Amino acid sequence: MSFIMKLHRHFQRTVILLATFCMVSIIISAYYLYSGYKQENELSETASEVDCGDLQHLPYQLMEVKAMKLFDASRTDPTVLVFVESQYSSLGQDIIMILESSRFQYHIEIAPGKGDLPVLIDKMKGKYILIIYENILKYINMDSWNRSLLDKYCVEYGVGVIGFHKTSEKSVQSFQLKGFPFSIYGNLAVKDCCINPHSPLIRVTKSSKLEKGSLPGTDWTVFQINHSAYQPVIFAKVKTPENLSPSISKGAFYATIIHDLGLHDGIQRVLFGNNLNFWLHKLIFIDAISFLSGKRLTLSLDRYILVDIDDIFVGKEGTRMNTNDVKALLDTQNLLRAQITNFTFNLGFSGKFYHTGTEEEDEGDDCLLGSVDEFWWFPHMWSHMQPHLFHNESSLVEQMILNKKFALEHGIPTDMGYAVAPHHSGVYPVHVQLYEAWKKVWNIKITSTEEYPHLKPARYRRGFIHKNIMVLPRQTCGLFTHTIFYKEYPGGPKELDKSIQGGELFFTVVLNPISIFMTHLSNYGNDRLGLYTFVNLANFVKSWTNLRLQTLPPVQLAHKYFELFPDQKDPLWQNPCDDKRHRDIWSKEKTCDRLPKFLVIGPQKTGTTALYLFLVMHPSILSNSPSPKTFEEVQFFNRNNYHRGIDWYMDFFPVPSNVTTDFLFEKSANYFHSEEAPKRAASLVPKAKIITILIDPSDRAYSWYQHQRSHEDPAALKFSFYEVISAGPRAPSELRALQKRCLVPGWYASHIERWLVYFPPFQLLIIDGQQLRTDPATVMDEVQKFLGVLPHYNYSEALTFDSHKGFWCQLLEEGKTKCLGKSKGRKYPPMDSDSRTFLSSYYRDHNVELSKLLHKLGQPLPSWLRQELQKVR
């Protein structure tokens, strides 16, 4: 019995212990279950102890994920649609700066509070490959109709959205972003950021290490996400302000950029919690453009860097290199080769100044020449004179021969094919004598300049080819002849470091596939800022990007450049007097006054020669001298004559006796339908007035055909007019060529609109060719008013109708007349009815478009056009 009682008590004790254990287990499990739930929704205090080196413990799902598959990006044009708050907004300008630096096409719209979206689709093709909102709230709060249209477009064409959240209040904000399953906190200060290495977004950016320190600004927005459809890209810790919301964990990591993977609604989005002032945000922005465009808007990861050291042997005492500086240059070159493949400093010398420093500096000169094979070399000018100051080629040749003789005496290679002019003088604006002398003495194939098309902004710098010399853009790096001491750097040493570490110099490398950097001898003596700059730049680029840095010899580099940018081969000449820097490095013997104030652009066979005769009758209007090679017309803007340069062009014009009252002009009737002429003309003479004459395009086509017959064109003699204009695509090439010259210039609206892309409407005068033929005095009064030329010339008294010739002529003294030559006003059989009917139908749509354009411009319809439009009804 006692045994049974003992067993019973033991059993009770065991049950109580088990029950107690179960209760404790339940309590512990409940505690950890609750803690786990809380950790998923609020970033716990433990997160503050986590560093970027231990990313797997961060409170986000950081496993590698796959975003929505992008659609075929070829279904859209490679153009970015950018919605900005205003055309002057700071963030909007930063966005445009990156797009322009990357040479991506874009279209700007002011983000509408209400109203219609721009047209998104044209002929079943999407107009935009990517949409960027400077203020993402304008996208989120869009009215439902336009939002559904935009989202439908994005889904159908696989178009992504990039947006920036801008806080409007000064206090810390916390709210749910409309339509998105996560919370955001605004107006925060953050620090210590790192990159999610699993983000599918990053390409240029390397997830390497923690970026310690405070991030710029106190207006940051951070995202608290807990959904597999959203992936953080960058994290940062929230700093602890006094008014920090209780829901924000102190020192916790939050996302400052998130990637909506498109799993929810089929649209991928990248949302930024701040502007682009922070360099890492700017880098991710570049990657986001590449990713969301299906890599159609992307640059290669290869970066070619050439570091020029100008002014070798030049410089006053105390600023030059000594032996230790030269040894440091060699050591650093070897060091840089570990990070920049084939890195070699490129030394530009002026032999006249050899051994003109202190004794130690002269020894430095000798040390350089003793290591001549370790570097690349290029000629500066012998005496460091600016080439534009030499007015004849022979003087330039003499200077170059002296420098070449020095090179040969000291074993400096003379076959690199590269040269740089002091202060970039003579390269652009072009000093032809420099190009010719370079070819004769050095056989130069490449040079570089920071002046084309202008020094600033640097992102607009381009290359071109002239006289078979390839001209590449040159970049500055913040080092000039006077920047030789670290502590005395303009703005303080931090300014140089900021440029290197995510600033201007860093992004020069990121955004330019090829960079030729200008430095100077003085940057490698004293504090050796040149070495400091490029060692630290290479380290920073390697640490934070996946870019592949390398160096090529100059000629190879130039060929690589024009492989990447073949559209830059043709130069675009500008007026040197419109840029003070250009004017300063342009010969004082030249003048911009010899550029025309207006152009008569054609088209051919509309009466342009008659207009020319009437214009030169005016005492204040002067024309170009005739060209013996192109039927008296200069034909500069539309032909290869353009590559002869502006000196060649201006030589056709006289120097005006009075710049204010004299009007220079030229007539080249082929300009009208030229693809290149409008852009070229607008670049060189942007304020020039443009005059065109329009007659019935059917009559113009027939007149051109007869003109070609009179010049014994084989196709015109062989085929009838109707056979020419109605020829099919399989017709002989010579017949198709004649057909094109007959018909295409008559597409009046298309050609005028091309000119209006580059010239404002008030600079364009459209003359009714039929009225010019019947009432030239009235037309010439209109022309004088349009040009603003004085004194007013009375054409009613100066013109007389020649009934024998059939057109108006200039009335001279004693009743004599001056008329157009025998080739003008030629009579020929009337056009056959079949051809007239064919052309009336062919030009119908073109004439309708012309009427719409003239109505839009507020210009009257010519009488012939009104007659043609009546046939349309």
Swiss-Prot record:
Entry-listed glycosylation sites: 146, 226, 342, 392, 658, 794
Catalytic reactions on record: alpha-D-glucosaminyl-[heparan sulfate](n) + 3'-phosphoadenylyl sulfate = N-sulfo-alpha-D-glucosaminyl-[heparan sulfate](n) + adenosine 3',5'-bisphosphate + 2 H(+)
Location relative to the cell: Golgi apparatus membrane
Name recorded for this polypeptide: Bifunctional heparan sulfate N-deacetylase/N-sulfotransferase 3
GO molecular function: deacetylase activity; heparan sulfate N-deacetylase activity; heparan sulfate N-sulfotransferase activity
Residue ranges that the UniProt entry lists as topological domain Lumenal: 35-873
Enzyme Commission number(s): 3.-.-.-, 2.8.2.8
Subunit and interaction comment: Monomer.
Stretch list, region Heparan sulfate N-sulfotransferase 3: 590-873
Active-site residue list: 605
Keyword Transcription regulation: no
Tissue expression remark: Expressed in brain, kidney, liver, fetal and adult lung, adult pancreas, placenta, fetal spleen and fetal thymus. Not detected in adult/ fetal heart and skeletal muscle.
Protein source organism: Homo sapiens
